[in-house]
């Protein structure tokens, strides 16, 4: 078999030929070296050639050890040359679905999730309200410097911006985050306030819209910050082994001493310690981490930017129909406030819930909710008042009954005393009359005796 170079080692094997007598040849030749200094580093790619058939087994083992040592040196040198942290295999790139349905230039990073897409939709709604405002028409298009004769405009304003440009960028998903959208909106109004003096109509209009934007931007910014906080732990995942932070209950167990194969199980002290630790963990539960408290008002405003469901709209329509006449005027004013064209019509307005914008719907929803809460509070107060009246009436009746009972008992007591007195008097009178009657009868008997004696005397004579 012909010999050839082997990649990485430069060693080739040749099959030893047997002699005609069947005995293995005892002749051994020294290894042939083409060029000891080349080692494949020169341009002609000359490599070391070693005939394994011509060297002994001991020399083969030594050569193998030498090559392995050189290979380890090469590997260690490669590790030193490579930057730290790049020793992992490259992760294959996966195509991420963009937020705008696969179009190029879409929102990436944190905006790829549904939460950020929903916030950007709310930003689009806010931008539409600014552009439809009665003072927003002047900011909807770029400033026409030539037509207006503003020759010094670009000297003062270094970065022009308008709401129409913001609308275009938002529709093409050129904003990486809602914060960039807010910067361009602020830049539009700040440019107008910078170029126009204080007291100018444009300055006043820009100030009004900027204040309106800042007011409506607060819940969106809060919602975006909450979304970023939720995504932050996912980005900072540590792939190292988890380390327990509850170190006060962990005891270092000593290594078991070498014992015979028939050694008894570990002493029960460890079990007792584990039982005590479990009891302590039951009596002293771990307190959860305190999350940052978001103001309730901001959370309510952030939730108010969502669309109303079909059931909520239906319930709102029914509640509006149940409102009394004095509350309908406030409802009309709420609708006219954001729909100026309705103010020119008659007092009767045909209301279509689906035609109202989101902000008007939420304001009507809050108005109806507050009215229902106030109505329930009044009913509760009336119920408490009626209960208090009934209780006071019951107490007064109880007191009057107690008073009457006391009077009756006192009268009964007095009557008892009178009856007992009468009985005593009756008893005394009866005894005296009986005595007198008995004495009378005695006298009568004596009289009869005297009469009888007299009669006898007369008879004797």
UniProtKB/Swiss-Prot annotation:
Give the matching SUPFAM superfamilies. Answer: Bromodomain
Q: Which keywords belong to this entry?
A: Bromodomain, Chloroplast, Chromatin regulator, Plastid, Transcription, Transcription regulation, Transit peptide, Ubl conjugation
A Pfam family for this UniProt protein? Bromodomain
Q: How is this protein annotated for GO cellular component?
A: chloroplast
For bias type Basic and acidic residues, the affected ranges are 376-392, 452-461
Q: Does the keyword Transit peptide apply?
A: yes
Per the record, where are the segments of Polar residues compositional bias? Answer: 393-412
How does the record describe the protein's post-translational processing?
Sumoylated by SIZ1. Sumoylation reduces capacity to bind to acetylated histone H3.
Q: Where is the NET domain?
A: 298-379
Give the Gly residues compositional bias ranges: 1-11
Q: Name the principal localization, coarsely classed.
A: plastid
Q: Where is the Bromo domain?
A: 114-220
| Keyword field contains Endoplasmic reticulum | no
Record region (Disordered): 1-41, 376-461
- Specify the transit peptide boundaries: 1-51
Q: What is known of its domains?
A: The NET domain could serve as an interface to localize different proteins or complexes to chromatin.
Q: What exactly does this protein do?
A: Probable transcription factor that binds to acetylated histone H3.
Please give the name of this protein: Transcription factor GTE3, chloroplastic
This protein's species is Arabidopsis thaliana (Mouse-ear cress)
């Amino acid at each position: 078999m012909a010999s050839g170079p082997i990649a990485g080692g430069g060693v080739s094997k040749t099959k030893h030929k047997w002699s005609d007598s069947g005995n293995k040849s005892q002749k051994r030749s020294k290894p042939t070296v083409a060029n000891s200094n080349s080692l494949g580093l020169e341009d002609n790619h000359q490599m070391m050639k070693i005939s394994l058939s011509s060297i002994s087994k001991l020399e083969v083992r030594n050569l193998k050890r030498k090559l392995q040592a050189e290979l380890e040196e090469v590997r260690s040198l490669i590790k030193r040359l490579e930057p730290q942290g790049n020793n992992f295999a490259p992760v294959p790139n996966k195509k991420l679905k963009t937020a705008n349905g696969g179009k190029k230039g879409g929102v990436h990073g944190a905006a790829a999730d549904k939460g950020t897409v929903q916030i950007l939709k709310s930003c689009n709604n806010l931008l539409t309200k600014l552009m439809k405002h009665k003072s927003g028409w002047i900011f909807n298009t770029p400033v026409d410097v030539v037509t207006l004769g503003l020759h010094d405009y670009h000297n003062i304003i270094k970065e022009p911006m308008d709401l129409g440009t913001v609308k275009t960028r938002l529709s093409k998903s050129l904003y990486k985050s809602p914060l960039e959208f807010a910067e361009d909106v602020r830049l539009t109004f700040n440019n107008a306030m910078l170029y126009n003096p204080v007291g100018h109509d444009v300055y006043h209009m820009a100030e009004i819209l900027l204040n309106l934007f800042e007011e409506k931007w607060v819940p969106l910014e809060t919602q975006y910050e909450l979304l970023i906080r939720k995504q932050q732990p996912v980005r900072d995942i540590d792939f190292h082994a988890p380390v327990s932070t509850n170190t006060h209950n962990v005891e270092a167990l000593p290594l078991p001493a070498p014992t015979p194969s028939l050694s008894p199980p570990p002493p029960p002290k460890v079990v007792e310690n584990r039982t005590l630790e479990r009891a302590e963990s039951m009596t002293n539960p771990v307190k959860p981490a305190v999350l940052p408290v978001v103001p309730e008002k901001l959370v309510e405003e952030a939730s108010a930017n969502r669309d109303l469901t079909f059931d909520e709209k239906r319930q709102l329509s029914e509640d509006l129909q149940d409102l009394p006449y004095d509350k309908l005027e406030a409802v009309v004013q709420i609708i006219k406030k954001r729909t100026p064209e309705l103010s020119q019509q008659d007092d009767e307005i045909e209301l279509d819930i689906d035609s109202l914008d989101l902000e008007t719907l939420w304001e009507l929803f809050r108005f109806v909710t507050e009215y229902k809460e106030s109505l329930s509070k009044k009913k509760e107060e009336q119920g408490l008042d009626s209960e208090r009246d009934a209780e006071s009436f019951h107490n007064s009746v109880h007191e009057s009954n107690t008073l009457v009972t006391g009077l009756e008992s006192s009268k009964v007591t007095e009557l008892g005393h009178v009856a007992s007195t009468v009985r005593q008097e009756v008893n005394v009178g009866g005894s005296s009359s009986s005595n007198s009657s008995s004495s009378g009868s005695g006298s009568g008997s004596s009289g009869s005796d005297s009469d009888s004696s007299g009669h006898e005397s007369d008879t004797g004579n």
